[in-house]
Amino acid sequence: MSAQDVDTIRTAYEEFARHDAAAVLAKLDASVEWVEGGGGDSPSGTFIGPDAVASGVFAVIGANFDEYHVDPGEYIDQGSRVVVKGHFSGKNRGGAVLNTGFEHVFDMRDGKVVRFENKPDDASAWIAGWTG
């Protein structure tokens, strides 16, 4: 199943880039745990379920950024876990620039994301991009 999980996650990034939040949310388990570390005006905490992710994460991104890009680079298959290393970039509505790498950790079960964790590479760059 892990190769299928990698394909699922790869497709989710493509859908996110096309602003198709509904398609991304459909890949989440009904009780998904979505973990964001926070900083600046970024989402912070654990969001449970797709509706909480939509309102607490995706809507916050849209409200804060004119440009927001999540560019996956490397996909690492770890069985029921998929780790993605990539790069965030963008410009928030206050003019601050977001520019840092990331590691995203997806735990999968039955083809759905059951847990996600966002780990920006540079906390100060993450906070700076979300401030202003």
Where do the model's predicted regions map?
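A beta-strand edge to alpha-helix "cap/lid" segment located at domain peripheries
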Residues: 4, 58-132
